[in-house]
Amino acid sequence: MKITRLHTYRVAPRWMFLKIETDEGISGWGEPVIEGRARTVEAAVHEFGETLIGKDPARINDLWQTMYRSNFYRGGAILMSAIAGIDQALWDIKGKALGVPVYELLGGRVRDRMKVYSWVGGDRPADIVQDMQRLLEGGIDTFKLNGCEEMALLDSPRAVDAAVAKVAAVRDALDMRVDFGLDFHGRVAAPMAKPLLRALEPLRPLFVEEPVLAEQAEHYPRLAASTSIPLAAGERMYSRFEFKRVLEEGGLAILQPDLSHAGGITECHKIAAMAEAYDVAFAPHCPLGPVALAACLQVDFVAHNAVLQEQSMGIHYNRGAELLDYVINKDDFRIDAGFIRALPKPGLGVEVDEERIVHASRNPPDWRNPVWRHADGSVAEW
């Protein structure tokens, strides 16, 4: 079998699908994208594609290493996201060719179902309780919401109190019927992270995500020592080499690599195994589309330390399309009592509606994240 062609499709809301075709008529799908930089990743995918044409798609490890190591400059969000989507599509091809789900190729399932959670509240959390109550009625009892809005390097105690008040309102309304993680989203700098974490402790969040930016990872051990809340990070780390450093230094209880940003299934399967050796949980980041989610689930079902899976149904970014709008086998993605079962179809387990994808790609979105500013006019972390 040989790779013959790569197609990319940018579609609403902010996703990009990749189709890799072969000379035997088997095609694989991936989801390589950086939210807000889709066109840049698209260029990288096609640049890698020039070296993939004519190659055997079954040699996934060799193709991965070739894409990663054959260029002097490597890594980073753009290149690793391009590799990630290609890698997903290659695993999809191999599973389809052999007639088995990818998790069978990775050694088989260690669990029967996977716990999932939903995003609520938007960039500036609002209507949180109503959103949670609606989803709770549908069987989802675990959530994530942004833990704060802009926060200056040194901010007023009032900013801490305002953030805590929003979270307290959720706990007061729903008590312990729900679990929720809080995403600081890199908005909080080290001087403010410690008092904010301390103030949130009585509300018993499941975890705090990106308590500080990944480039400030040296603060993770210090922050972990100051709080009982499990700390999580990883969506802005792109290879096992970056995760190696945070595992060695400690501080994180949960790793959250994104399988569309951190090298795909091949790389994130290794990251999960590394985390297990340090008694650290694995909870892939995935506010993206159905192919990305399907790729995450393949690793979730073989990684013993996988604890939670993010999924984007109803997320505030989904304007123009919902998670399953481009999926034919929607029933396979059904969530029951907060869990999803292993996808049974060969490959990644997602049957995409190619006709709808092609049609949607004729009017591609150009999504950009907003630029926020502090009260003094300086740029704030979004």
Curated annotation (Swiss-Prot):
Q: In which pathway does it act?
A: Carbohydrate acid metabolism; D-galactonate degradation; D-glyceraldehyde 3-phosphate and pyruvate from D-galactonate: step 1/3
The GO annotation for biological process reads: amino acid catabolic process; D-galactonate catabolic process
Q: Which UniProt keywords apply?
A: Lyase, Magnesium, Metal-binding
Where is Mg(2+) bound in this sequence? 183, 209, 235
Active site feature? 185, 285
Kindly give the InterPro entries that the UniProt entry links to this protein: DgoD-like (IPR034593), Enolase-like_C_sf (IPR036849), Enolase-like_N (IPR029017), Enolase_C-like (IPR029065), Galactonate_deHydtase (IPR023592), Mandel_Rmase/mucon_lact_enz_CS (IPR018110), Mandelate_racemase_C (IPR013342), Mandelate_racemase_N_dom (IPR013341)
Report whether Magnesium shows up as a keyword of the record. yes
Reaction catalyzed: D-galactonate = 2-dehydro-3-deoxy-D-galactonate + H2O
Listed EC numbers = 4.2.1.6
Cofactor(s) this protein requires = Mg(2+)
Q: Provide the site residues for: Transition state stabilizer.
A: 310
Report the co-factor binding details.
Answer: Binds 1 Mg(2+) ion per subunit.
| Site (Increases basicity of active site His): residue numbering on this chain | 258
Q: Which GO terms describe its molecular function?
A: galactonate dehydratase activity; magnesium ion binding
Keyword Ribonucleoprotein listed = no
Please report which protein family the annotation says this sequence is part of: Belongs to the mandelate racemase/muconate lactonizing enzyme family. GalD subfamily.
What is known about what this protein does? Catalyzes the dehydration of D-galactonate to 2-keto-3-deoxy-D-galactonate.
User: Note on file?
Assistant: Reaction proceeds via an anti dehydration.
Q: HAMAP family recorded for this chain?
A: Galacton_dehydrat (MF_01289)
- What protein am I looking at? D-galactonate dehydratase
Q: Which organism is it from?
A: Variovorax paradoxus (strain S110)
Gene name of the record: dgoD
